[in-house]
């Protein structure tokens, strides 16, 4: 038979539970206060603080790994490449190319010309000093050019240079076709727009709502919706 607790024992248990609840409330209050202080401190930090922190940590780790590789007499760049998959390496290379010569779409003809110029300059081969000195010796004073200098028939392009020019022109033509592709207008299609901007807007609406409005549109065309 279970022993009946006395009033003093019951009171002691209640006090113990109240004390435990009080401790938990104090702990929760302390935790909440610390979280509020931490959140306020985070709000006062710059917007890009987390990114800068991650970058600083990455730089420290990279410097440490580089120093360890040098101490062991190993090529750090080669070790890094061994840890990168072919897919990631290709993605990094493409990202680097986009950063060096980004394609932001057409803005002005001057910007497009400057972008093409930078791309062509970067694709130029390394300078051949021997060829430079040889041409300088062959052409003499005409090498630097002047108001009355004529180099016609005195210079000859190599087959490799000609092939490179042809290849580059073909690539430019292909890129121009891709960026300047015009969509053929269908004469039999319904005309539900008043200009090009309105046509694009209607196409966006069709992508989202055509399945819901197809029946209503058909009824309106047949005149059965009245």
From Swiss-Prot:
Keyword Nucleus: yes
Disulfide bond entries: none
Primary localisation category: nucleus
A Gene Ontology term for the protein's cellular component: catalytic step 2 spliceosome
Short name of one Pfam family: SYF2
GO biological process, alphabetically ordered: mRNA splicing, via spliceosome
Domain of life: Eukaryota
Residue runs in coiled coils: 1-29
GO molecular function: RNA binding
Keywords: Coiled coil, mRNA processing, mRNA splicing, Nucleus, Spliceosome
Subcellular localization: Nucleus
InterPro entries, per the entry: mRNA_splic_SYF2
Functional note: Involved in pre-mRNA splicing as component of the spliceosome.
PANTHER family: GCIP-INTERACTING PROTEIN P29, PRE-MRNA-SPLICING FACTOR SYF2
Quaternary data: Identified in the spliceosome C complex.
Family of the protein in this entry: Belongs to the SYF2 family.
UniProt name for this protein: Pre-mRNA-splicing factor Syf2
Biological source species: Drosophila melanogaster (Fruit fly)
Gene field: Syf2
């Amino acid at each position: 038979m279970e022993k009946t607790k006395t009033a003093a024992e019951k009171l002691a248990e209640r006090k113990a539970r109240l004390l435990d609840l009080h401790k938990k409330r104090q702990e929760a209050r302390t935790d909440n206060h610390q979280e509020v202080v931490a959140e306020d401190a985070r709000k006062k930090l710059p917007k890009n603080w987390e990114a800068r922190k991650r970058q600083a940590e990455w730089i420290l780790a990279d410097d440490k790994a580089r120093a360890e590789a040098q101490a062991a007499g190993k090529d750090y760049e080669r070790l890094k490449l061994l840890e990168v998959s072919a897919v990631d390496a290709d993605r990094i290379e493409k990202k680097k190319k986009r950063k060096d010569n980004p394609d932001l779409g057409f803005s002005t003809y001057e910007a497009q010309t400057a972008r093409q110029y930078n791309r062509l300059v970067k694709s130029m081969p390394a300078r051949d000093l021997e060829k430079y000195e040889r041409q300088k010796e062959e052409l003499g004073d005409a090498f630097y050019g002047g108001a009355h200098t004529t180099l016609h028939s005195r210079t000859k392009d190599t087959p490799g240079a000609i092939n490179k020019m042809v290849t580059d022109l073909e690539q430019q033509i292909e890129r121009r076709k891709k960026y300047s592709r015009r969509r053929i207008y269908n004469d039999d299609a319904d005309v539900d727009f008043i200009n090009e901007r309105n046509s694009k807007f209607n196409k966006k609406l069709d992508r989202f709502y055509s399945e819901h409005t197809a029946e209503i549109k058909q009824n309106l065309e047949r005149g059965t919706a009245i």
